[in-house]
Amino acid sequence: MRNRKPWLVLLLVAVAGLLLFVWRLGMTGLVDETPPLFAASAKAMAETGDWLTPRVNGLPRYDKPPLVYWLMGLGYALPAQDLWNPFGTWASRLPSALSSIGLMLLMALTLLRRPQGQPDGAQQAVTAMAAALAFALSPLVLLWSRISVSDALFSGLLSAALLLFWWRYARLCRWWIPWLVLGLAVLAKGPVAVVLAGLTALLFAVLQRDLPGLWALWRPWRGLALTAAVALPWYVLELLVEGQPYWDSFFGYHNLQRFTGVVNNHLQPWWFFFPVLVVASLPFTPLLLAGLVGALRPQPAPPEQSLQRFAACWLLAVFVFFTAAATKLPSYWIPATPAAGLLIALAAQNLRPGWRSAVLRGSTLALVGVLTAGLAAGNLWVPLINEPEMPTLSAALLASGALRRASLCFGVGGVAALLLWWGPSSARRGWLLVQQLGMGAFVVTALVPMVELGDRLRQLPIRRMASLALEQQRPQEPLAMVGILKPSLHYYTQQVVVYEGVQPNGPLNLNDRLAKEQRRGQQPSPASPGTSVLVVIDGNTATLPHWRGVPHQRLGTIGLYELWRVPRPALSQWSKDLAERAGLAPDWQEPRPERY
């Protein structure tokens, strides 16, 4: 029996997505360290008209293909930025938010067009909404859908392509549509999209014992040609323009080396994604595991009833591939979260009276109870938080009341779900959805305010320091940042910033780079009498011996950060003295896989 009002279900899903991902989206600044690099690259595209190569802080940025930069850049190209986009975050975050909302709608539509099992109309609506919300309420999705990076866009496009592959198997779309979307996924993050799609398809074909049928339906050779036609033109143009540096960085470092070696010290044990799977689906992890086990039964499923099995293969493909990779990050699990949402909702729909259902519901609500109690007891564990960049975080978080509101939302949702569970059979179908509504209220009333609190404590000092630097800056005076490196300083000052870390030869590097380094927006200049450099430095770095002795004038202090004016001749002399005393030398020209 088909739901007679699918548009109403989709409308409710869209409203939920807007509340979860768009509500107050642009009311906070960029979050260091990665999002400002994306935002600055996209803004540079819009301002310079160079839509081929992303560039940040005067250097090419080769780590991701251009689609996310193009979409962000379209936002930055709109007029009246100061009115609607004061922090630069509406334009840079909307692609992530809209990608997740679009995926929620596609998941719900899939379950409305091809209901799994024999649910009545009301159960179809509940399952469709529950699947979309189980995906959207994953902690990983809530976080990455509201920041300026490419993960949510990539996950949305890859997941849409995978769902459309299943649509083709269920005779719901033409063969070429999923391949077209897969090409966009390749433009969002690279060839890993094809690898994950291929691994999912292979696992599904093996479990369904229908490789010839799937091959005929999906037409992989023609499909891969279409995917290549969508994605390859940009890659070819980029290679022609940028040459070997692009090949070495994107394909060599950011793709091959991330799989075969550890990048950026992201070394994790082989079992890393087991706890990630558990945490990413809380508090519905018992339902996810039940849905996964139920999907792997040996007998093949009819094509139109095989969505649960397809979702299981999808989740396992992500798990196997990234477990095999040497570099592991929690964000690598995001492409599996839509599959987890489908498995959770279908497992809840398939619950029947008996001890097994009681255990699954009971364990899920027990996890809700644990989360409720943990949030209510925040005064016991929040003071243990030690964040050097936000020393007042613990006190501010407790004073905000956000944890009490969070506990209330989880608790009310859990009690409502328990009452429905004990109620008449017609009401039991809504127990999962009611709990999800409580979690949605948590996002709006507690999580978003906590994010805004973190912005005031961590990012506002950087924005204020950027304003101070612009006020104090003399004509042609360069700007540097040492110690804690914040790319948002580059974004908010809209100029090249020379970044140096805490290493002892930092002053030597800074002096040498000002005299020799050339990049877009920065020309080398001699340390002539009367020249100076503005330096943003954090308080801890300022106490280190190799920086403490640098002659400077302190122009202001904001939070952890100080603004110095350093005479260039004095910096040059200090660097020479430091080199002689400690035997140090500049090393900024040595090859580095990532630089900004």
Regions found by a protein language model. Give the residues of each.
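Membrane-integral, polyisoprenol-dependent glycosyltransferases
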Residues: 1-357, 557-564, 572-578
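Membrane-embedded architecture of ER/inner-membrane glycosylation machinery
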Residues: 2-3, 7, 176, 294-596
